[in-house]
């Protein structure tokens, strides 16, 4: 189980799949996403179900990006990784919450 941002960064590689469990846009909850690119700035993902050609073509075909931000703006509970706008960590400041699938 992922317990901190460093572990998450090491775990996410191209091909890793994520299930969105919370999002600032309610329509994104339940999406299945696949990591396409990871760097020191953030992680790029494409939407798998149903594919969204507009979003998946963004950033030179890498999909949408979620910036890493500060470790203090993340929480890790019960296998769910959550990124927030700031350290407040409320439903109003949630950017995205997700579960890494087929986690070892």
Where are these regions (language model features)?
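Mixed-charge, Lys/Arg-rich low-complexity intrinsically disordered regions
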Residues: 1-14
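Short, exposed beta-strand/loop patches in secreted or surface proteins that constitute
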Residues: 10-11, 34-37, 57, 73-74
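Short beta-strand-centered aromatic/proline hotspots
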Residues: 27-39
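SH3/SH3-like beta-barrel fold
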Residues: 45-47
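Intrinsically disordered, low-complexity, charged/polar segments
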Residues: 50-104
């Amino acid at each position: 189980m992922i317990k901190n941002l460093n572990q998450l960064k090491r775990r996410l590689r191209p091909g890793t799949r994520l299930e969105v469990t919370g999002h600032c846009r309610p329509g994104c909850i339940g999406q299945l996403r696949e990591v396409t690119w990871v760097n020191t700035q953030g992680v790029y993902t494409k939407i798998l179900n149903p594919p969204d050609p507009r979003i998946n073509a963004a950033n030179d075909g890498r999909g949408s990006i979620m910036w890493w931000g500060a470790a203090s703006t993340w929480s890790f509970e019960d296998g769910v990784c959550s990124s927030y706008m700031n350290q407040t960590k409320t439903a109003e400041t949630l950017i995205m919450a997700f579960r890494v699938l087929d986690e070892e």
